[in-house]
Amino acid sequence: AVAHVLYGYNTLLAHEVGAGKSFEMAASAMELKRLGLCQKSLFVVPNHLTEQWASEFLRLYPHAKLLVTSKKDFEPGNRKKFCARIATGDYDAVIIGHSQFEKIPLSAERQERLIQEQMDEIEEAIEEAKAQVGEHFTVKQLEKLRKSLKQKLKKLQGADRKDDVVTFEQLGVDRLFVDESQNYKNLFLYTKMRNVAGLSTSEAQKSSDMFGKCRYLDEITGGRGVIFATGTPISNSMTEMYTLCLLYTSPSPRDVEE
């Protein structure tokens, strides 16, 4: 598993509970840095497990230099300072909670580009559906999605842009380790299929945020910067495999569908 993280592409550690995923991730991060294959690893773990994760990491590497977040670090008055510590510090690993990870935004420009890409794909799908007989429901569904994305884009463009916000791109992170990655399974999805059990087209903001950050890491690492770990990669929905493909390979949704 460690060798795959070092020399392969984006990795999914889908071992059962107790199999040693935490140690695999810690060893991977330390070896990546020792070999000069990455500069900074960010561990995103369940909020209540940040200290436990740090303890496990130090049990394997007692002299590792870690930066571990606390609840106070992401309070409004402290967030910028903590993000600056991530950006300027030389750490073997930075460990933060899931909800704290969401509070570190991608740049507005990158968010706008991702939304526009989704809108372009929907526009193409609408034209294809209009050309086919009996796809009236699909067209309506896609137009609803397009409207929702337009509103999202308009809100983003109208938001105040503060120059002092530290964005995810500015952290200097080039490896992302995500524990309990099944929490990010509800991703943007459009499909012609209807009345299929377990087929959900709803999207969670945290999943959308994760997708954008994975896309960024793919760009700067050549598709080697994302390592997910979970004991339940697919639990109860047929769309979860689709989501995995999007997060780990980052093609367009239409490429995956084809």
PLM regions and their residue ranges:
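Single conserved hydrophobic/aromatic residue that forms the stacking wall/gate
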Residues: 248-258
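P-loop (Walker A) phosphate-binding loop of NTP-binding proteins
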Residues: 16
